[in-house]
């Protein structure tokens, strides 16, 4: 199911779902939970400078939300003048109040309420990630959101959005990032800087897909290693992955040597024909001379 194969929850490309986002946005306007904002980039820049000078939090909220209480006539005048605008959520939160939510991996987390009037629809009619993801998750019947723990700080805003839209919020499972040793330091694996973050890295090196899956299974649940050592004849799908066995502090360290060892072990259990087929498919794309050689002497 997806943009190629289709399915009952399509369309699957966000640019094709604008009518859905606009319908929800209009609903929020109709119940007084969204409003047009005509602040220019200069206005927002001056706002940030004022907040920095006053040592206030950065963002569009409270007294800094200049367009929050514009009258109908003021809004109409801006629109008649052709002024650019974005649509913002009218937050009902209080940053000085705390709330708790249950994360499936980290347990109970306490956070301040959201009070930022975030952008729902940009001036070009396209929604930012947060609003699109709330709409998509609801209409695609998503029950559990699994994502990087850097999104924990966004939970107050996302939960307020779900509630404002009249949607039931999904459950959350925030995963620790995969880390990499970089000299004397350890940092988060980056899809921009690190080739290991791309699928092509493993494909080009001839590491079988199943071996990569096995390796990441060892990172996903702390007890997978022990289970697999005793069940090497079984498929990793036979293992019952659970949220409570996922890493809750520090994050896992990417270990290429362990991945290579798992790959060797996996290949050693394949038949001669399976090894040849894997090698044939890989060399067709990455080493044509070698491919010609192995096909010339197939009997060996």
Model region roles, listed by residue range:
Residues 17, 21, 154, 208:
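Hydrophobic (often cysteine-bearing) scaffold residues that line and stabilize catalytic clefts
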Residues 8-19, 31:
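Short coil/turn segments at secondary-structure boundaries
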Residues 1-9:
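A glycine-rich helix N-cap at a beta->alpha junction
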Residues 165-300:
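Catalytic adenosine-cofactor/nucleotide-binding cores of aminoacyl-tRNA synthetases and other
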Residues 2, 17, 52:
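Charged, often glycine-rich, active-site loop that binds/positions anionic groups
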Residues 22-29, 213-216:
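Non-transmembrane alpha-helical segments in soluble domains
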Residues 14, 27-174, 179-191, 198:
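Active-site cores that bind ATP or allylic diphosphates and position pyrophosphate for catalysis
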């Amino acid at each position: 199911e997806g943009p190629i194969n289709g399915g009952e929850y399509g369309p699957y490309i966000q640019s094709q779902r604008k009518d859905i986002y606009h319908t929800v946005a209009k609903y929020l306007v109709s119940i007084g939970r969204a409003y047009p904002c005509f602040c220019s980039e200069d206005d927002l820049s001056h706002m940030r400078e004022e907040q920095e000078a006053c040592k206030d939090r950065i963002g569009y909220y409270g007294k800094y939300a200049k367009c929050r209480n514009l009258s109908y006539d003021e809004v109409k005048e801006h629109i008649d003048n052709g002024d650019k605008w974005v649509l913002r959520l009218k937050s009902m939160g209080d940053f000085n109040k705390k709330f708790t939510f249950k994360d499936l991996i980290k347990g109970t987390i306490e956070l301040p309420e959201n009070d930022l009037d975030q952008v729902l629809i940009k001036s070009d009619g396209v929604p930012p990630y947060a609003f699109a993801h709330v709409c998509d998750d609801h209409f695609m019947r998503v029950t559990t959101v699994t994502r990087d723990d850097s999104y924990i700080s966004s939970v107050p805003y996302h939960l307020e959005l779900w509630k404002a839209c009249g949607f039931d919020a999904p459950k959350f499972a925030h995963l620790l990032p995969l880390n990499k040793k970089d000299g004397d330091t350890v940092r988060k694996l980056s899809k921009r800087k690190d080739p290991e973050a791309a699928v092509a890295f493993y494909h080009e090196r001839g590491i079988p897909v199943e071996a990569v899956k096995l390796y990441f299974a060892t990172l996903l649940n702390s007890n997978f290693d022990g289970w697999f050592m005793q069940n090497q004849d079984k498929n990793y799908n036979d293992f019952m992955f659970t949220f409570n066995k996922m890493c809750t502090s520090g994050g896992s360290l990417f270990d290429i040597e362990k991945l290579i060892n798992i790959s060797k072990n996996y290949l050693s259990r394949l038949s001669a024909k399976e090894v040849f087929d894997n090698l044939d498919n890989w060399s067709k794309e990455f080493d044509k001379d070698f491919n010609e050689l192995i096909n010339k002497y197939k009997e060996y």
